[in-house]
Regions:
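Class I S-adenosyl-L-methionine-dependent methyltransferase catalytic core
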Residues: 1-122
């Protein structure tokens, strides 16, 4: 979720959205960035949590997933937060992303799309 830019755009477009971030500071920044009035009926939900543990979302419930996971241990997004995959080396990061992909597949409606924005790890 980072600073909530995708959630802000969803709100402006009248879309419902769920933002999840493991870092409480990112959650707080996103909440602040979403404190504006907009003449739409969108519902924006923000939650501190792990993208590999989406137990609070029903199976086949989400229409579109847009995710921008960290780049393994290239950029540290937090200090000492359990489950933060930005703290992991490449091999462990890929293993953790497998769990994220499984949960994304579970919550995504059949025939819908998931966009994963990530850099190539080939040259790392």
């Amino acid at each position: 979720m980072g600073s909530g830019t995708t959630l802000v755009e969803a709100k402006l477009l009248g879309r419902n959205a769920v933002g999840i971030d493991i870092n409480p500071q990112s959650v707080s920044i996103s909440e602040t960035n979403l404190q504006f009035h907009c003449d739409t009926s969108s519902k924006i939900y923000i939650r501190e949590g792990n993208a590999a543990e989406l137990h609070f979302i029903k199976d086949a419930y989400i229409d579109f997933i847009c995710t921008h996971p960290p780049y393994a241990d290239i950029i540290k997004y937090s200090e000492g937060i359990e489950g933060d995959i930005s703290m992991l080396g490449v091999k462990s990061f890929i293993d953790a992303m497998d769990k994220v992909a499984y949960e994304a597949y579970r919550v995504l409606k059949k025939g819908k799309m998931c966009a994963v924005m990530i850099l190539s790890l080939i040259h790392i």
